[in-house]
From Swiss-Prot:
Cellular component terms per the entry's GO annotation: host cell; host cell Golgi membrane; host cell junction; membrane; viral envelope; virion membrane
Glycosylation sites: 35, 67, 78, 121, 131, 236, 307
Provenance organism: Equine herpesvirus 1 (strain Ab4p)
Listed Pfam families: Herpes_gI
Function in brief: In epithelial cells, the heterodimer gE/gI is required for the cell-to-cell spread of the virus, by sorting nascent virions to cell junctions. Once the virus reaches the cell junctions, virus particles can spread to adjacent cells extremely rapidly through interactions with cellular receptors that accumulate at these junctions. Implicated in basolateral spread in polarized cells. In neuronal cells, gE/gI is essential for the anterograde spread of the infection throughout the host nervous system.
Assembly, per entry: Interacts with gE.
Transmembrane feature ranges: 320-340
Compartments reported by the entry: Virion membrane; Host cell membrane; Host cell junction; Host Golgi apparatus membrane
The keyword DNA-binding appears for this protein: no
Name of the protein in question: Envelope glycoprotein I
Amino acid sequence: MAKLTGMFSAAILLSMAICSTAIIYRGEHMSMYLNASSEFAVYPTDQSLVLVGHLLFLDGQRLPTTNYSGLIELIHYNYSSVCYTVIQTISYESCPRVANNAFRSCLHKTSKHYHDYFRVNASVETNVLLNITKPQPTDSGAYILRVKLDHAPTADVFGVSAFVYDLKSKTVPDPMPTTQTVEPTTSYVSTPTYDYTDDVTTETESTSTSTQQAMTSTQTPSATWGTQLTTELPTNETVVIGQEALLCHWFQPSTRVPTLYLHLLGRTGNLPEDVLLVEDSEFLRTTSPAHRPSASPADGDDFKQTNSTSLKARNKIVAMVVIPTACVLMLLLVVVGAIINGAVRKHLLSCASRRIYRSGQGGASAAERRRLTCGPTLAASSESLADDTTSSPPTPKPSKKTKLETDPLMEQLNRKLEAIKEES
């Protein structure tokens, strides 16, 4: 009996796994729908890596307002270096509530990038959670979408994974973070040559001292255009050096914060390095190669082509919604105008609706002249027409005799006939 019960349970689980076609991650304020939580690509064969899905509102996640705004931070967690970096921020403004979809038909969208990750993009309004153009092995890792609504005090965190396999070196990226000990002082900076001075706080078990250090980052001809900096920093310390540099924040799981998702959920507001990102439109207008060391013109063209989907979606919305609505409004205006015109003709221009003109010969009464001047309308009753007929008899038709009496020959003949009658 127990064996049959186990087989029946396994059959139910297998049928549920076969019938399930999507994954839904439920957050506090919104949720994420996707068909697969991870995707892989082969370097250098594959030209793109795309993860499809969208954000939505489930039951109990309804918005308190008709229009809302929000910010999405795309964060890359590198498995090899065990650190995370904010690579893109997308700001949506004045978004209406369209069914249960999130960030659809927004009035304004502003996208900003960190220049080393210009090939990596997210566009949730077009059902694209992650799009990597020409993926490389260094693009492997976890990509986290941190969604913050303006009216919500906390943020929601959703994650997907990307794996890029290198056929030349026959290496496979680790699906989980490495267990080796990584010093929390390791950060990677990709920036041109500059001098800066920053305050770094060093904490020990007994005392906490503040030291001021001067560092110089020199651009090297390496493939990553990066320089490894080593400073003594406490765990999860946010450090910004210079005006264009963006450090990779080291994260170490602990009993209090076991995962990176809980670490990002515990942070309030926007991440401080968001102000260092460059708007996409300004980045595309930049022609000097010194400002974009790792992005080629082909990458910019690919990114422009990828982000043009938002314009295509907006044009499709205009063609499907605005144009039919305008046609319906025009038809309604035509119908209303016809109704108003008929009412005016019926009630205000009754004299002009129907007139009968007759000759004025013979004696006509005042009632007849009034009837001829302003004839009865189409809506006049039969009784009013009968009253007009009885009050004024019809004018007799003029006979041809009147014309004969006016002839002198006929008058002479009439006189002769009368004389003959008198003589007889």
